[in-house]
Amino acid sequence: MTQDGSAPANSAEHPWPVRSVSVKVMQWIDRLGSIWVEGQITQINLRPGARTAFLVLRDPSADMSLQVTCDPELIRRSPVPLQEGSRVVVYGKLVFFPARGSISLRVLEIRPVGVGELLARIERLKALLAAEGLFDERLKRPIPFLPKVVGLITGRGGAAEHDVLTVARNRWPAVRFEVRNTAVQGPTAVPQILTALAELDRHPEVEVIVLARGGGSVEDLLPFSDEALCRAIVAATTPIVSAIGHEPDNPLSDYVADLRAATPTDAAKRVVPDAAAELALVRELRARSAAALRGWVDREARALAQLRSRPVLADPLREIDRRATEIERLRADARRCVRHLIRTESTATAHLREKLTAVGPAATLARGYAVVQRVTGPERHVVRSIADSPAGSQLRIRVADGAVSAAALGTTAAGTRIADDTGGN
């Protein structure tokens, strides 16, 4: 102890003795005071003549329990007989036993949780989950048509397991199951179901999980309305079918599951197809396909026969011959038109040639006219005026039958009397 009476700081050099730890635990428990606790009775030890009754109170949603002691009269005077599996609310104070380092709850009052209260709690939880959107249809995952492996969570050796396996194998003999047997009622049900659900959800071949139980009372079905289980179903990646088989008060697992089945038998029918029905459907579809194909072939054959009966196909050369005759006629008409056009144009051309000849230079020269050209080196220019041919110019005179070379001796203006050959300029 320190000088002020307090315990020294705890360390490896200054460890607390067990008695100090026990004292601190008792002090903390004393400060906690009396408390209300809810749980499920898993064990009752009520010996005749004993002054103390011993119970074990378990949390339905977790693998945790608490030792409870009480006056035996509290159990005997309970308005509802208390038994293993009963849900209760107790009032008492924790007691620490230093000698063995254990804690027990000394109970002064026990209140059984009735069916009405249980249903009210379920309704409150249902409203909470609905407000969070956990019942939304958009969250529902589709059930595979033919799953590789079906996971099954159910009680060991119960009717639910037998019904699911028998019905499923009768419908599809090759179906495979991964079965996890758990408690389906009582305080251990929820932890075991959660463990099995996690295992099957991780299984690489399990494509759908069936949670099955063959009905029961409200108290028996409480695990399937547990909040932890409902949230685990929503969080799972594998589609889950809830087949608890209880009407009309459905457990909450029915609302959060991807598919609700009325019974385990119904669940087997919903997750596995009926091989006989599928074969019958295949046969029906094959028959319908064959009938449709035959009908199509018949229609096409009739259409082909109609086409073959048409004249153009019955005697295809007839149309070719008719077209050939028409083409030959058109060719003869074309030749006739071309010859007529050539004759017409030839006559017109001859007339034009005659006109050109009559007005052309050669005809004019033939009538005694001449064309006078002044020769300047290699160039020749037609003389149209006396100014174009001054005296001394070299001239070329073209007549009808040739040309004459001459020289200009002089010029005489129009209207001037021409003198004799020796006069003039």
Curated annotation (Swiss-Prot):
Extract the InterPro entries matched here.
Exonuc_VII_L, Exonuc_VII_lsu_C, OB-fold_nuc-bd_dom
Q: What GO MF annotations does this protein's record show?
A: exodeoxyribonuclease VII activity; nucleic acid binding
What does the entry give for GO biological process? DNA catabolic process
Where mainly located? cytoplasm
EC code(s) of this entry: 3.1.11.6
Q: Which reaction does it catalyse?
A: Exonucleolytic cleavage in either 5'- to 3'- or 3'- to 5'-direction to yield nucleoside 5'-phosphates
Q: Which UniProt keywords apply?
A: Cytoplasm, Exonuclease, Hydrolase, Nuclease
* Pfam families, alphabetized: Exonuc_VII_L (PF02601), tRNA_anti_2 (PF13742)
- Please state where this protein is localized: Cytoplasm
Does the record bear Kinase in its keywords? no
Q: Does the keyword Mitochondrion apply?
A: no
State the top-level EC class: hydrolase
GO annotations of cellular component type: cytoplasm; exodeoxyribonuclease VII complex
- This protein's source sits in the domain of life called Bacteria
What's its job? Bidirectionally degrades single-stranded DNA into large acid-insoluble oligonucleotides, which are then degraded further into small acid-soluble oligonucleotides.
Give the family per the record.
Belongs to the XseA family.
State whether it acts alone or in a complex, and with which partners, per the record: Heterooligomer composed of large and small subunits.
What name does UniProt use for this protein? Exodeoxyribonuclease 7 large subunit
